[in-house]
Structure formats: structure tokens, C-alpha cells
Amino acid sequence: MFSGSIPALVTPFRDGAFDEKAFRRLVDWQIENGSSALVPCGTTGEASTLSNAEHHRVIEVCVEQAAGRVPVIAGCGSNDTMNALLHMNFSKKCGAQAALCVAPYYNRPSQAGIIAHFSYLAEHNDLPIVLYNVPGRTVTDILPETVCELAKRYPDKIIGIKDASGDLSRVTDHRMGIGKHFCQLSGDDELALPANAAGAVGCISVTANVAPRLCADFQAACAANDLEKARELNDKLYPLHYAMFEDASPGPVKYALSRVFADINEDLRLPMVPCNEAARKAVDAALVHAGLLELA
């Protein structure tokens, strides 16, 4: 089971190309600062702007650089089931420990279609699957009854969920419908504390890109049932959680990384553009609040 602070890693670019050297340094920095697993090629990693060859190279580099120190949950989502399987096949071959598979987006399948999609993936690859529910982006909601059906149908294949629905009742729905063994990970940093209280065991995090040690310590406090410490760390991180979405993501998180980690610049791929001035001010203020930046 995966648990703790799991960054949804940014994909660094330089002059329009994947900056492999910066990414390797980011992987090392994350592991050195307590991240318990890594997710390349998720939403924050701008996976939708990567060619398949680039997508696979990012996963491959992440697995190589992690070198078994922490597990890699490879972003394998697609609204084309065969393309999702292609990503899973590559990820399995290169040594990833699991696949993060988002609900098919844009084509808006029914719940029956969602079940068919994930069933096909589970039946045609041995890589464990973490479902990813983010209806605000996909316009498709993996309903609790669908999650429960999939988890019961494929108990060794569909092992968990990253839920970014914003609905905290889902954690209890899944826990009661499937059991404690089902790995529930928050997909919303600002809801990680109440999600953990309800039965989640960690967070696939945007903020952890920038504040890996604080996020890891926060998750450790939750796991130890040290509510006072968890609240203290959550309060430190709270403004940063919201600053990461002050403008279209991942613009703010790349700006924040450029402030605290010299190897990462703000380069994004169109249609994403660098964050606006208001977002920069919010990020700077949040970094100061978290003790990660001193302004002159």
C-alpha cells in the first residue's frame, strides 16, 4: 500500500524540451526530503502536452533515478483505453510499481463505460492501478458504487484511488464499501487532514513539489495520530495549498519551485503560460508563511 506524501511531479522544460537533468535532481531532492513515492506524468506534470515518446521517457527517468528508493506510480491516464494500456505496458516494462489512471475525460463515458475502461486495463496488464477521480477536470465522476464494484471485481489489480472530487464523504463511502485495505489518497492538499481522519492514508500532492519535507512531516504526524502536530504543520502549509491554484496549474507551482529550487525554471508548454503577478505575490507570501522563503 502507498501512503504518506506523494508529489505529483512537475515536468521541467528547457528550450521547449524535457529537462532530464533538472528532473533527476528534483527526484533526488524529493526522496532526500521524505517523499514516500513519486508520480510522474500526472496533471501537474503536464502529461496532456507530452508526446507518447516524451511521456514514456519521463516515467523511465523517474524510475531510473528513484532506483528503488521509493516506489513510482506512473501517470498512465488517457481518454483512449488503448493508449492508457500502452502507457501501462511501458511503465510495467521499465519498473514502475503502479499506474495512476484518470477517468476518461472529454468523451464523458457512463458509469458502465468507466467500468469497461478500467476492467479492460486490469485484465490486460499486471500493473496495480490507482484510480484517479478529478471530475472538475474530466467532467466525469467515478461514483463510489463504481469504485466499490471495480475494487471488488479486481482486488489485486485495482488497489486504491486518488480522489480529487472535493467530497470528503467519498473516503467513508469507499472504506465502508471496500475495506481499510483499499488505498485512499487525497487529491486535494487542503483536504488532506480531514481525509486522513476519515480513513485516507496520504496525499498525491501538488504542494509537495515545493515543500516536500513539510508535507512529509505532516503526513507522518497524521499517521502517528499526533493531531496537534498535524494541525500545526497544516496551518503552515495551508496558504501554500491555495496559492498553487491562484492561477492555472501548474504555473504557480513551477514559479514556486523556481523560488526555492534553483534547478527548475518556469517553462511551460502551451496552452499553459506562466502565472500572473497576483499569483506570484500569493505564492511568495505563502512561501514566507511556510518558512521556505525570506524576502528582502
Swiss-Prot record:
GO terms for MF: 4-hydroxy-tetrahydrodipicolinate synthase activity
A single cellular component GO annotation: cytosol
Origin superkingdom: Bacteria
Binding site for pyruvate: T44, I204
Group of enzyme by EC: lyase
Record-marked site positions (Part of a proton relay during catalysis): T43, Y106
Primary subcellular site in the record, as a coarse category: cytoplasm
Keywords, ordered alphabetically: Amino-acid biosynthesis, Cytoplasm, Diaminopimelate biosynthesis, Lyase, Lysine biosynthesis, Schiff base
Positions of the catalytic residues: Y132 (proton donor/acceptor), K162 (schiff-base intermediate with substrate)
Pfam families registered for this protein in UniProt: DHDPS
E.C. code: 4.3.3.7
GO BP terms in the entry: diaminopimelate biosynthetic process; lysine biosynthetic process via diaminopimelate
Subcellular location: Cytoplasm
Reaction equation(s) it catalyzes: L-aspartate 4-semialdehyde + pyruvate = (2S,4S)-4-hydroxy-2,3,4,5-tetrahydrodipicolinate + H2O + H(+)
Pathway participation: Amino-acid biosynthesis; L-lysine biosynthesis via DAP pathway; (S)-tetrahydrodipicolinate from L-aspartate: step 3/4
InterPro entries: Aldolase_TIM, DapA, DapA-like, Schiff_base-form_aldolases_CS
PANTHER family hit by this protein: 4-HYDROXY-2-OXOGLUTARATE ALDOLASE, MITOCHONDRIAL, DIHYDRODIPICOLINATE SYNTHASE
Stated family: Belongs to the DapA family.
Subunit architecture: Homotetramer; dimer of dimers.
Role this protein plays: Catalyzes the condensation of (S)-aspartate-beta-semialdehyde [(S)-ASA] and pyruvate to 4-hydroxy-tetrahydrodipicolinate (HTPA).
Alphabetized NCBIfam families for the sequence: dapA (TIGR00674)
Protein name listed in UniProt: 4-hydroxy-tetrahydrodipicolinate synthase
Gene for this chain: dapA
